[in-house]
Amino acid sequence: MKAELIELIARVIQVLQINIRWMTWNLFLAFIPLVLSVWLFRRIKRSRSSVWWFGFAVFFAFLPNAPYLLTDVIHLIDDIRTIQSVWMITLVLIPVYLIVILAGFEAYVISLINMGYYLHRIGKTQWILGMELITHALSAIGIYWGRFLRFNSWDFVTQPDAVITQGIEEILGKQPLVILAISFVILTVLHWLMKRVTLGFIRQGCTNIANNSSKASLKPQTSDE
């Protein structure tokens, strides 16, 4: 029994060591658009220079990497077959995958919240929903290109011809269109849910800060005589 447990733990550690490489890399790619969204949409400066537009293009090129982590659930299925222990799968494997996938998708949600904040600030609040839906559609295409055609974000620069020709040709088939439609619905629903959860936490935090500030200002001050 002890030997079997040691062997099982060693197998779990081996699986996690293999996964930590692509998990770290995919999370790094997912947080690039999040950082860019802060720089693009949260700055006080309103002018949109050529550098801003370049950053905006890079932002959209890397943005699908954040929800792309949802598709990494296929690795979880392979790992479950490898480990074959209900307890290790439940207590170790699934929580690790949930943290990584949720972190990536939360980066996507916050990036869109930042974009919506920017549109509201420049007086284009009515564009927010449309831009979110367009972003979901483009991200669904990006996820398909990444998962099935193995394109990367930087392929827009290194091999733009292949991305445009092969990428567009591939998504016009019946099966790809079904996959894109399902991906679009999943992104839309999950974003809608997590956006409200995220904004709820933000508002709760702001309320707590405001309440603490009010209590501090109403607290009687004593003076030394």
Predicted feature residues:
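Hydrophobic transmembrane alpha-helical segments in integral membrane proteins
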Residues: 3-30
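Membrane-interface transmembrane-helix boundary segments in multi-pass integral membrane proteins
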Residues: 17-25, 91-93, 152, 164-188
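Transmembrane alpha-helical segments in integral membrane proteins
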Residues: 32-42, 102-119, 184-204
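Membrane-interface helix-boundary motifs at transmembrane edges
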Residues: 40-51, 117-127
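A glycine-rich, hydrophobic loop/mini-helix early in the fold
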Residues: 50-91
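Hydrophobic alpha-helical membrane-insertion segments
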Residues: 53-64, 131-148
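Juxtamembrane non-transmembrane "cap" segments at the membrane-aqueous interface
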Residues: 141-163
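Short, highly charged, low-complexity non-transmembrane loops/tails of multi-pass membrane proteins
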Residues: 202-223
